[in-house]
């Protein structure tokens, strides 16, 4: 027998087996043939494996979306991964925002309150960006990779053996059908022999599949450890971000902030929440409005007729002819006037004079 004859016979045998399985499967669907049912334990294991696969895929994909919301970036990373190449490093959103803030602060002037605050905010955003990058790397290594290994490795093996078990089951039921239809003694003997062989192969494949499926419990235990690692990575990330923002808030405590709810303003002048070396902790918020009490240096000025030099913290446009417009960083002369509202001083610049809000000023020694 030459190799070609052997290949032809093998091809014919394979075709016959495939046809036999197709016929058996079709007859089962039509209710014209009996089907060997798997034992309940094996069915439960198969169901558990399928459930694990479905939810692992969903969790894995949504975690990827959480860590990298940009779909184009995810596709790029996927392509590089398939090419077994490292994806080029890309700046993330917090880092980009931080760089914009730093550039803006530098252009506005690091010596100005707003420029200095922008630079500090930008540096914090870049630190958050670094923490974000570390979270992605740690989560990908300790959480996503094990999940992906299960989907692309263990479960593929399970699916392959499950498919093989299905084929062995079809072979077994086809052999049972042929035995039932056999009439001649010789045909019956041959069919019985075939049935014993297919039964043995089916039992063997069922055992192999069962052993693989029982490993799902170990998979769950492993994924639980990976989940703990992911939670720890998130905890570290959020703790870092909280600390960064806490430090930033403390640094910005010496800068003016123009935020006051429009609904709570009692005059046309915006009132900053805190001022460097001027308001400090004496600014307290109450329900419905922001109450500011003067620190000692301003109180002394109001209680006397003396004049002081003051540096303007940021620009102010006069609302009417009784007020004096201000430019950030300019130095003016200020003094109190009896009967004037406690939030205002009289400002003087050359021959110009008018009311100025005290919250826009830093008194100089």
UniProtKB/Swiss-Prot annotation:
<keyword id="KW-0446">Lipid-binding</keyword>
<keyword id="KW-0496">Mitochondrion</keyword>
<protein>
    <recommendedName>
        <fullName>Endophilin-B1</fullName>
    </recommendedName>
</protein>
<keyword id="KW-0175">Coiled coil</keyword>
<dbReference type="InterPro" id="IPR001452">
    <property type="entry name" value="SH3_domain"/>
</dbReference>
<dbReference type="GO" id="GO:0005504">
    <property type="term" value="F:fatty acid binding"/>
</dbReference>
<dbReference type="GO" id="GO:0043025">
    <property type="term" value="C:neuronal cell body"/>
</dbReference>
<keyword id="KW-0963">Cytoplasm</keyword>
<keyword id="KW-0472">Membrane</keyword>
<feature type="modified residue" description="N-acetylmethionine">
    <location>
        <position position="1"/>
    </location>
</feature>
<dbReference type="GO" id="GO:0031334">
    <property type="term" value="P:positive regulation of protein-containing complex assembly"/>
</dbReference>
<dbReference type="GO" id="GO:0090148">
    <property type="term" value="P:membrane fission"/>
</dbReference>
<dbReference type="GO" id="GO:0050775">
    <property type="term" value="P:positive regulation of dendrite morphogenesis"/>
</dbReference>
<comment type="similarity">
    <text>Belongs to the endophilin family.</text>
</comment>
<feature type="region of interest" description="Required for membrane binding">
    <location>
        <begin position="1"/>
        <end position="37"/>
    </location>
</feature>
<dbReference type="GO" id="GO:0005741">
    <property type="term" value="C:mitochondrial outer membrane"/>
</dbReference>
<feature type="domain" description="SH3">
    <location>
        <begin position="305"/>
        <end position="365"/>
    </location>
</feature>
<dbReference type="InterPro" id="IPR035695">
    <property type="entry name" value="SH3GLB1_BAR"/>
</dbReference>
<dbReference type="GO" id="GO:2000641">
    <property type="term" value="P:regulation of early endosome to late endosome transport"/>
</dbReference>
<dbReference type="GO" id="GO:0032991">
    <property type="term" value="C:protein-containing complex"/>
</dbReference>
<keyword id="KW-0597">Phosphoprotein</keyword>
<dbReference type="GO" id="GO:0000139">
    <property type="term" value="C:Golgi membrane"/>
</dbReference>
<dbReference type="GO" id="GO:0006915">
    <property type="term" value="P:apoptotic process"/>
</dbReference>
<dbReference type="GO" id="GO:0051084">
    <property type="term" value="P:'de novo' post-translational protein folding"/>
</dbReference>
<keyword id="KW-0968">Cytoplasmic vesicle</keyword>
<dbReference type="GO" id="GO:0042149">
    <property type="term" value="P:cellular response to glucose starvation"/>
</dbReference>
<dbReference type="GO" id="GO:0141038">
    <property type="term" value="F:phosphatidylinositol 3-kinase activator activity"/>
</dbReference>
<dbReference type="GO" id="GO:2000786">
    <property type="term" value="P:positive regulation of autophagosome assembly"/>
</dbReference>
<dbReference type="InterPro" id="IPR050384">
    <property type="entry name" value="Endophilin_SH3RF"/>
</dbReference>
<dbReference type="GO" id="GO:0016020">
    <property type="term" value="C:membrane"/>
</dbReference>
<dbReference type="Pfam" id="PF03114">
    <property type="entry name" value="BAR"/>
</dbReference>
<dbReference type="GO" id="GO:0061024">
    <property type="term" value="P:membrane organization"/>
</dbReference>
<feature type="modified residue" description="Phosphothreonine; by CDK5">
    <location>
        <position position="145"/>
    </location>
</feature>
<dbReference type="GO" id="GO:0006654">
    <property type="term" value="P:phosphatidic acid biosynthetic process"/>
</dbReference>
<dbReference type="InterPro" id="IPR028503">
    <property type="entry name" value="SH3GLB_SH3"/>
</dbReference>
<feature type="coiled-coil region">
    <location>
        <begin position="156"/>
        <end position="185"/>
    </location>
</feature>
<dbReference type="GO" id="GO:0008654">
    <property type="term" value="P:phospholipid biosynthetic process"/>
</dbReference>
<dbReference type="InterPro" id="IPR004148">
    <property type="entry name" value="BAR_dom"/>
</dbReference>
<dbReference type="Pfam" id="PF14604">
    <property type="entry name" value="SH3_9"/>
</dbReference>
<dbReference type="InterPro" id="IPR036028">
    <property type="entry name" value="SH3-like_dom_sf"/>
</dbReference>
<dbReference type="GO" id="GO:0010508">
    <property type="term" value="P:positive regulation of autophagy"/>
</dbReference>
<dbReference type="GO" id="GO:0048102">
    <property type="term" value="P:autophagic cell death"/>
</dbReference>
């Amino acid at each position: 027998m030459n190799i070609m004859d052997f290949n032809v016979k093998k091809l014919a045998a394979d075709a016959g087996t495939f046809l036999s399985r197709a016929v058996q499967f079709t007859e089962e669907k039509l209710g014209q043939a009996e089907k060997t049912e798997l034992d309940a334990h094996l069915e439960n294991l198969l169901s558990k494996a399928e459930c694990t696969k479905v939810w692992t895929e969903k969790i894995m994909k949504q975690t990827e979306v959480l860590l990298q919301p940009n779909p184009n970036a995810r596709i790029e990373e996927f392509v590089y991964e398939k090419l077994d190449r490292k994806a080029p490093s890309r700046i993330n959103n917090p880092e980009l925002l931080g760089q914009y803030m730093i550039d803006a602060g530098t252009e506005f002037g690091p010596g100005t309150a707003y420029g200095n605050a922008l630079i500090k905010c930008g540096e914090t955003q870049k630190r958050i960006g670094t923490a974000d990058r570390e979270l992605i790397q740690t989560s990908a290594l300790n959480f996503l990779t094990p999940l992906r290994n299960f989907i692309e490795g263990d479960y593929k093996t399970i699916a392959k053996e499950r498919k093989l078990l299905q084929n062995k089951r079809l072979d077994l039921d086809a052999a049972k059908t042929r035995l039932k239809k056999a009439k001649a003694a010789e045909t019956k003997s041959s069919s019985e022999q075939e049935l014993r062989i297919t039964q043995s192969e089916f039992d063997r494949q069922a055992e192999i599949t069962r052993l693989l499926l029982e490993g799902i419990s170990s998979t769950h235990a492993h994924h639980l450890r990976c989940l703990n690692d992911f939670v720890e990575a998130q905890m570290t990330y959020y703790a870092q971000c909280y600390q960064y923002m806490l430090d930033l808030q403390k640094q910005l405590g010496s800068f003016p902030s123009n935020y006051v709810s429009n609904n709570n303003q009692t005059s046309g002048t915006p009132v900053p929440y805190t001022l460097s070396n001027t308001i400090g902790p004496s600014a307290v918020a109450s329900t419905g409005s922001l109450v500011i009490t003067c620190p000692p240096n301003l109180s002394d000025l109001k209680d006397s007729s003396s004049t002081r030099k003051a540096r303007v913290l940021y620009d102010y446009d006069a609302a009417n002819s009784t007020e004096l417009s201000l430019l950030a960083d300019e130095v003016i002369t200020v003094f109190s006037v009896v009967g004037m509202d406690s939030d205002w001083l009289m400002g003087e610049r050359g021959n110009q004079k008018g009311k100025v809000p005290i919250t826009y000023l830093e008194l100089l020694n």
